[in-house]
Amino acid sequence: MPLLVCGINHQSAPLTVREKLVFTPERTPLALQSLLAEKAVNEALLLSTCNRTEIYTTVDEAATILRWLSKQPQLSGIDLRSFCYARRDIEMVRHVMRVGSGLDSMVLGEPQILGQMKQAYLLARRIGAVGSELGRLFPAVFAATKRIRSETAIGANPVSIAYAVVQLAKRIFSHLNQCQILLIGAGETIELVFSHLYNQGARHFFIANRTLTRAKQIAEPYHAQAIRLSDIPTYLPKVDIVISATMSQLPLVGKGAVESALRQRKRRPLFMADLALPRDIEPETAQLEDVYLYNIDDLQTLIAQNRQTREAAAKQAEAMVEMQAIHYMRQLQVHKAGDTIRRFRERVEMLRDQELEKALAHFQRTNDPKAVIAHFAHNLTNKILHQPTTKLRQAAYEDQVQLLLSAKELFDL
């Protein structure tokens, strides 16, 4: 059965396209069920992050997946063929291992993607979208990725989008301990941002989230204040830094609210980072004077500088990915050969049982056991060799040289 990945990422599609092709954890189960309803789609796994949306499946044609993606209502008017890529078989295996290892990430070697991939796998398996092929592939990918990360320095000197944002904020505000900071969201990205900011000396935080209880869980260890999303306009005039990363389908911070906050701040600068997809902060906010608004794509330049520390490790990791991908495909061939071996063994055992039954019946009618055994051996040998002999003669007649050579190797002749 073929292996296929089809999708878009930060290299193939701009933010304006990527943000329209985001599947939240709440939407993913229904999306997978819809995909499995498509003809020829028997297995599927959907990975959707701020930098990529990829579908891993077992169909022959990428066009099947493209057609399904194009049916998504949010993509009306967008020709995905200009942005999508497809990888098959060993190229697909190589790609998945590169993604899981962080080699294909905007931030080289970032570890979050592996956790996101594992969650996507568990979700797909839970709803029955993972069959034998993907069920064999992804545990192998996770094992290979673990080995790559432990045997190379690809994860050394941690850098991430969260870390890059903090570096960028320090260019505007060199003394983070004097800044009031508003973090919007309560997911892994915000937790990482929170941790990096705190480690850099920041101490004054407000955490806004749709669920106040979740905001309090994140805020309490840092003695921060949890607020509701509806309170954001009230707190905007008080803060110097705003960093947002939610799964909201609509903007949470509008240009008007920021404009009002700036008037109350008496034009003091406001650093804003929108790490969400779709975006949490209206893009037009960047037009306001004294606002420094950055989105995910804006971070690429800074992240490119950080990549240099991991380039040597990346070369080693790439070599390991290649080795692991080849190993997996060879193991897959061995597994497929196992079915052939099993059927061959079953056939020979059937012939043996048939001849053994005849021999046992013959024992009842003769006093010469040696003759019975000789007859049994002769008949069994003929039955086993009949089909291969016929095929070899046919191959010789049709000048199938390669088949004859393979037979010599197979039977050690």
From Swiss-Prot:
Q: Where is this site: Important for activity?
A: 95
Which InterPro entries does the record associate with it? 4pyrrol_synth_GluRdtase (IPR000343), 4pyrrol_synth_GluRdtase_dimer (IPR015896), 4pyrrol_synth_GluRdtase_N (IPR015895), GluRdtase_CS (IPR018214), GluRdtase_dimer_dom_sf (IPR036453), GluRdtase_N_sf (IPR036343), NAD(P)-bd_dom_sf (IPR036291), Shikm_DH/Glu-tRNA_Rdtase (IPR006151)
Entry's free-text remark on domains: Possesses an unusual extended V-shaped dimeric structure with each monomer consisting of three distinct domains arranged along a curved 'spinal' alpha-helix. The N-terminal catalytic domain specifically recognizes the glutamate moiety of the substrate. The second domain is the NADPH-binding domain, and the third C-terminal domain is responsible for dimerization.
GO biological process terms, semicolon-separated: protoporphyrinogen IX biosynthetic process from glutamate
- What this protein is called in its record is Glutamyl-tRNA reductase
Subunit composition and interactions: Homodimer.
Its keywords, alphabetically, are: NADP, Oxidoreductase, Porphyrin biosynthesis
For this chain, the family text in UniProt reads: Belongs to the glutamyl-tRNA reductase family.
Top enzyme category: oxidoreductase
Miscellaneous remark of the record = During catalysis, the active site Cys acts as a nucleophile attacking the alpha-carbonyl group of tRNA-bound glutamate with the formation of a thioester intermediate between enzyme and glutamate, and the concomitant release of tRNA(Glu). The thioester intermediate is finally reduced by direct hydride transfer from NADPH, to form the product GSA.
* This protein's record includes keyword NADP: yes
> Could you state a single Gene Ontology molecular function term?
NADP binding
Active site as annotated: 50
Per UniProt, NADP(+) binds at: 185-190
This molecule's function is given as:
Catalyzes the NADPH-dependent reduction of glutamyl-tRNA(Glu) to glutamate 1-semialdehyde (GSA).
PANTHER family documented for this protein: GLUTAMYL-TRNA REDUCTASE
The protein's annotated pathway: Porphyrin-containing compound metabolism; protoporphyrin-IX biosynthesis; 5-aminolevulinate from L-glutamyl-tRNA(Glu): step 1/2
Task: Write down the chemical reaction(s) this protein catalyses.
Answer: (S)-4-amino-5-oxopentanoate + tRNA(Glu) + NADP(+) = L-glutamyl-tRNA(Glu) + NADPH + H(+)
The taxonomy runs: Bacteria, Pseudomonadati, Pseudomonadota, Gammaproteobacteria, Legionellales
According to its UniProt record, the EC number is 1.2.1.70
List residues binding substrate. 49-52, 105, 110-112, 116
